[in-house]
Amino acid sequence: MPLSYQHFRKLLLLDDGTEVGPLEEELPRLADEDLNRRVAEDLNLGNLNVSIPWTHKVGNFTGLYSSTVPIFNQEWQTPSFPKIHLHEDIINRCQQFVGPLNVNEKRRLKLIMPARFYPNSTKYLPLDKGIKPYYPGHVVNHYFQARHYLHTLWKAGILYKRETTRSASFCGSPYSWEQELHHGRSVTKTSQRHGDESFCSQPSGILSRSSVGPCIRSQLKQPRLGLQPHQGPLATSQSGRSGSIWARVHPSTRRSSGVEPSGSGHIDYSASSSSSCLHQSAVRKTAYSHLSTSKRQSSSGHAVEFHKVPPNSARSQSQGPVFSCWWLQFRNSQPCSEYCLSHLVNLLEDWGPCADHGEHHIRIPRTPARVTGGVFLVDKNPHNTAESRLVVDFSQFSRGSTRVSWPKFAVPNLQSLTNLLSSNLSWLSLDVSAAFYHIPLHPAAMPHLLIGSSGLSRYVARLSSNSRIHNHQYGTLQNLHDSCSRQLYVSLMLLYKTYGRKLHLYSHPIILGFRKIPMGVGLSPFLLAQFTSAICSVVRRAFPHCLAFSYMDDVVLGAKSVQHLESLYTAVTNFLLSLGIHLNPNKTKRWGYSLNFMGYIIGSWGSLPQDHIVQKLKHCFRKLPVNRPIDWKVCQRIVGLLGFAAPFTQCGYPALMPLYACIQARQAFTFSPTYKAFLSKQYMNLYPVARQRPGLCQVFADATPTGWGLAIGHQRMRGTFVAPLPIHTAELLAACFARSRSGATLIGTDNSVVLSRKYTSFPWLLGCTANWILRGTSFVYVPSALNPADDPSRGRLGLYRPLLRLPYRPTTGRTSLYAVSPSVPSHLPDRVHFASPLHVAWRPP
C-alpha cells in the first residue's frame, strides 16, 4: 500500500503531537539506506523511466519544445536617458566628503574609471546581423524602433559612432582619457611598414605621443581621417601616395556629401580583396561640412580653422548628387507602382543630412565595419509594457574555447542579508536610473563591443524572398525599385508620422561601439556591484548611525527614526548627485520598518519571501498535476521558484532533492499525491529566517562512526549507534541530539559539513528531518583537539576537558562591508534626545 501523507509526516518526525520513541533511536533509522529506498519507491521518486508522454506545461512554466512567441508592441516608447556623466575625480570627491578612503574602496573605484575589457578573441559578424529579426511579422517597425533606440543612446553619450576605421565621434562631456585621444591633440608615430602611414596603436589603444619632425607634421595635417575639408591642393597631393587611406578609395568617392555603399555609386576598392566587407565608407562619411566653423587642434599645436566651403559646392546634401544615397535616389526615379517609395520620398523637400556627427571626435584602435553582437527590443519589464528595452547579445564572449571567464563577486546570501538588515530601522530604497550606463568604458574596448545596422535597403533585401544582396549591379532603376512593396510602403508611411525626416537618417548604415558598459557582457554586473558597494561603504562611514547597503543598482538606506531617515535621504541624494550618479526621485520607496529587498521582506523579526512570491507558490501547487510525468525543463523552473522559498520551510532544500536528481538525469518527474501533499504543506506554512545573535557557545557535539557524545555545560552524555554510520551522518545526528536535548541555538562542532548547514547530500529522510530540528541553529567551529565532546563520543566519560569560552559572532558573509557600521541599538528612544544622531552624526556634505 502506498505511503499516505500522514504516515510520511510521522516518519519524518514532523508531527509534534504524535508519540514517537526517543530521538536517539528514531533518527538513526532515517539514515538507513533500505528505508530510504522503500520510501522513494512508495512515493514514486526513483522511477525516472516512464512510457507515458511527458507534460511540457504546468501553469505558467513552459518546458521543452515550447516556443513562446515574442509580442511586438507598435506603440513602444523609447525611454529617455539623462545625460549621465560620472565625475572622473570620484575618489577625490569621496575623500572630501568622508576623509581618506580605505584600500578596498579605492581599488573598486579605480576599476571603473575607466572600465576595461580585453576579450581573448573577437568574432566579427556582418552588419546584416546587427538588428536581429526577432519579430518576423514586424520587420520594418522593429528595425526603425531599434534604430531610434540606438540613436537615443548615442545622443545620450552612451555609444560611440564609428566614423572611419580609426576614428569615432560621441556626444556628452569627454573624459580625460578621451581627450588624450582627441583628434590632433597628440602627434602619432607613423609606421613605415609597407610604406603605410597608418596610425600605429599601442595595445591599449592609446596612441603614443612623440616629437615628430616637421616633414611628418605637414603630412599629418593632410585629411587622412577625413576630418578636414578636401580642398584642391591637399586632396591632389594625397592621391599620389599609395599607402594612405584616401588613396585606396576610388577618386569619385571624395565628395563633400556622404558616401553610401549600399546605394548605386559602385565604389571600387582597388586595394581591398573583398569589396563586400568594406562598407567602411558607409560610416566614413567624408562630409564634415557641418563642422565648418568648429576649431580643431592640429598636430602642430596651432588651431586650424575649418575653411568655409563655398556655398555652391556645399549644397544641402539632400539636393546634392543624389546617387550617393539609396533613400534620395527615389526622388528622381519614375514611380514603379502606387506603393513606390518615391511617393514617400517626394513628400519632403529636405530630408536632412545622411549622417549625424557627434560633438567630439577621438582616435580609436582599428575598428572594422562589422558588428560583434546583435540587438532587439523587448518590454521594459513585466509591469511596464509601454516602454521598450534594448537587449544586446554579446554572448560570443561567454561561448567556445576562447570564452572570457568573468570575475566572480559575492552575492549576499539570505542569512547574511538577515543578519545585516534585520533591525528596527526605518528604510527607504533609492532607484539609480540606467545604472549600467554610469560606468565609462575605455575606448580601446570599442572594437570588441560593436552594434549597428546595415541600413534599411540591405535589411529589407535580406529579408525578402530572393536575396538581391549578391548582385552588385546597384544603381539600375529596376534594382532600386526591387524593394518597393505594399507592406514596406504602408509601414514607412505610418512610421513617417512618428519619425518624420529621421526616416532618412535611420535608413543609413551605422556602426556604434559602447562608451559605457553594456548589459550583455558578464563583466558589467561585476563592475556595477563593485561600484555601488564602494559608494555605500563611503556613505556608511559618513553617517555612522545609519545603514546603507546595495546590491547591483538597488540601494537601501536605514535610520533609527523617520525624521533621521529623511535628513539622511537628503544628504545622501545630494552626495550621489555631486558624484554624477542619477537618481530617479519618483521611484524612491519608503518602506517603514519592513524593508522589501531582493525578493524578501526583512523586518526586526527576520525575513520572509515577498507576497508576490507567496502567491506564485500557491498558484504553482494549484496547477501541479499528480501522476503525470513532467518534463525536466518544467521541473527546473518549478525548482527555481521552490528553491527561493526553501529556507523558509521546515525541511528546506533537502525536500527538493528528488526533483534535483531528475533534472540532473534529464528525465521526467512524476509527482505522487503524497509527495505533492508533503511539498504543498511545506510551502503553505513559511517560517521567518531570524537573524543570528552573538553569544558564548556552551554546547558541544562530536561523533565517531560508532558513537556520539555531547557536552552541555558541565554535563556529559554519550551513546552508541546500532550499526556503524558514515562519519558525516554520525556528526549530523550528534548535532541533532545536542539541539533537542539542550534547546541551545549555538552548538560547537568539528565537522565542516554540519557547519555548512547544507544537508542535501545526506540520506533523504534524514536530511529533511535534520533540517527541521536544526533550523535556526548557529554552529561554531571547534578543533577536534579542543572539543569537550570528543572524549564522551569515544566512550570516555571520566575525562573532563575544560569547557571552552567560544564566542560566536554572526557573519555578514562576504557582503562588502568595508566600513563596519557601529551596531544599532535595538530599542527606539521614547523621544529625541538633544544628543540625537540628527545633531551629532549628521554633518552637511
UniProtKB/Swiss-Prot annotation:
Positions of region (Polymerase/reverse transcriptase domain (RT)): 349-692
UniProt domain Reverse transcriptase: residue ranges: 359-602
Segments of this protein annotated with the region Terminal protein domain (TP): 1-179
A GO BP annotation: DNA replication
InterPro entries: DNA/RNA_pol_sf (IPR043502), DNApol_viral_C (IPR001462), DNApol_viral_N (IPR000201), HBV_DPOL (IPR037531), Rev_trsase/Diguanyl_cyclase (IPR043128), RT_dom (IPR000477), Viral_Replic_Matur_Polypro (IPR051320)
Site feature location: Priming of reverse-transcription by covalently linking the first nucleotide of the (-)DNA: 65
Biased composition (Polar residues): 289-301
Region described as Spacer: 180-348
Keywords (A to Z) from UniProt: DNA replication, DNA-binding, DNA-directed DNA polymerase, Endonuclease, Host-virus interaction, Hydrolase, Inhibition of host innate immune response by virus, Inhibition of host RLR pathway by virus, Magnesium, Metal-binding, Multifunctional enzyme, Nuclease, Nucleotidyltransferase, RNA-directed DNA polymerase, Transferase, Viral immunoevasion
One Pfam family hit: DNA_pol_viral_C
Residues where Mg(2+) binds: 431, 553-554
Catalyzed chemical reaction(s): DNA(n) + a 2'-deoxyribonucleoside 5'-triphosphate = DNA(n+1) + diphosphate; Endonucleolytic cleavage to 5'-phosphomonoester
Modes of activity regulation: Activated by host HSP70 and HSP40 in vitro to be able to bind the epsilon loop of the pgRNA. Because deletion of the RNase H region renders the protein partly chaperone-independent, the chaperones may be needed indirectly to relieve occlusion of the RNA-binding site by this domain. Inhibited by several reverse-transcriptase inhibitors: Lamivudine, Adefovir and Entecavir.
Keyword Nucleotidyltransferase: yes
Stretch list, region Disordered: 186-205, 222-245, 288-318
The keyword Nuclease is annotated on this UniProt entry: yes
GO function terms (MF aspect): DNA binding; DNA-directed DNA polymerase activity; metal ion binding; RNA-directed DNA polymerase activity; RNA-DNA hybrid ribonuclease activity
Signal peptide limits: none
Leftover remarks: Hepadnaviral virions contain probably just one P protein molecule per particle.
PANTHER family assigned: PEPTIDASE A2 DOMAIN-CONTAINING PROTEIN-RELATED, POL PROTEIN
Stated role: Multifunctional enzyme that converts the viral RNA genome into dsDNA in viral cytoplasmic capsids. This enzyme displays a DNA polymerase activity that can copy either DNA or RNA templates, and a ribonuclease H (RNase H) activity that cleaves the RNA strand of RNA-DNA heteroduplexes in a partially processive 3'- to 5'-endonucleasic mode. Neo-synthesized pregenomic RNA (pgRNA) are encapsidated together with the P protein, and reverse-transcribed inside the nucleocapsid.
UniProt-recorded name of the protein: Protein P
Species this protein is from: Hepatitis B virus genotype A3 (isolate Cameroon/CMR711/1994) (HBV-A)
